[in-house]
Amino acid sequence: MYSPGYVATSSRQSDAGNRLFVYEVIGLSQSTMTDGLDYPIRRSGSTFITVPLKRMNQEMRRITRMGGKIVSIKPLEGDSPLPHTEGIAKPSQSEGSGSEAVANPAPESNKTMTTTPKEKKADDIPVNIYRPKTPYIGKVLENYPLVREGAIGTVQHLTFDLSAGDLRYLEGQSIGIIPPGEDDKGKPHKLRLYSIASTRHGDFGDDKTVSLCVRQLEYQNEAGETVQGVCSTYLCNIKEGDDIAITGPVGKEMLLPPDEDANIVMLATGTGIAPFRAFLWRMFKEQHEDYKFKGLAWLIFGIPKSENILYKDDLEKMAAEFPDNFRLTYAISREQQNAEGGRMYIQHRVAENAEELWNLMQNPKTHTYMCGLKGMEPGIDEAFTALAEQNGKEWTTFQREMKKEHRWHVETY
């Protein structure tokens, strides 16, 4: 349905999720959580755990819960068993994991996933590697909820396998998703674009995945009937192991500048956090040798309730670990009040921090990004208009100057 090469592509990808990787883990300690494991926890040094690709993220979260720290991830050479079986434990039954512990790490000749090529040149921006008539057919590796009980709406984090193709992307780009089936006119559904929520190296760090942050669209039509978005509903309900038709990547407007000393102001509402998750993961979580962020990253994030804060634990952990380089500000509309006693929206946070934001924006190294619902734009413009007037400038003129300098970036929908 999607392309003449669909069957062949699907066949090549059928075993993608079974590729094996070796985690080197330190810091695991014996506890009630680790007592059920079939491999011993070392008192010192490293523990090595073999993990299939499709379970990498689950295993990362499990290791974190047990107090461990992953110091390296390496592909198991040839995706085959180790050359000897001595010291290899049975698969762990803890939390349904299909991982194994090994007595020895993978050969040192294997390239670790934290080793990366040099920074891409500015003109080396991948665009439309896969098009609607010949999409890439990937596999769903993960689909899990991002909001907590009591939240408004449904938001999912999805990760797709790219190992059987050559799709690559940069932080700030988007991919297209083609939902299966036909519309009410008998025509194939049109693709929908989604901002990429992972860095160029993917959530597993091996350059073989791409992730999205998707909210299920739901609204009332003129007849008062509840209508659900075709593509967002498809994505929120897709199962691990299912095929997914992907196009792209597209977009040059929202790219993260390569300058490690840049200041990055990010204004997001809801799933508009997606490109900024990619930015922040590259700045603070990956820590690659070819990119060491030294500037200030400031995220002002608008959400309706605390339960709707996406990636909350990761964001707050980064803010605590990098207080000199990352600032996190929430605008929680249904829980916080602005200075006038009304609901706290993102524009009110801009007004509260007017002087500091204005001073930052005068710096030619500062880039300002806005991503989220289109309805956020008027309020933001109003806040910046007042901000500019206080400093003797006209906002539209200053905004035009920043656009000309490629320092003002907007992606709303």
UniProtKB/Swiss-Prot annotation:
Binding-site positions, FAD: 192-195, 213-215, 219, 230-232, 271
A molecular-function term among this protein's GO annotations: ferredoxin-NADP+ reductase activity
One Pfam family in the UniProt entry: CpcD
Gene from which the chain derives: petH
Cofactor(s) required for function per UniProt: FAD
Compositional bias of kind Polar residues: 107-116
Main location: membrane
Name of this protein: Ferredoxin--NADP reductase
Membrane topology: Peripheral membrane protein
PANTHER family (UniProt xref): PTHR43314
Post-translational modification: Acetylated at the N-terminus; 6% of protein in CpcG-PBS and 12% of protein in CpcL-PBS is acetylated.
Assigned protein family: Belongs to the ferredoxin--NADP reductase type 1 family.
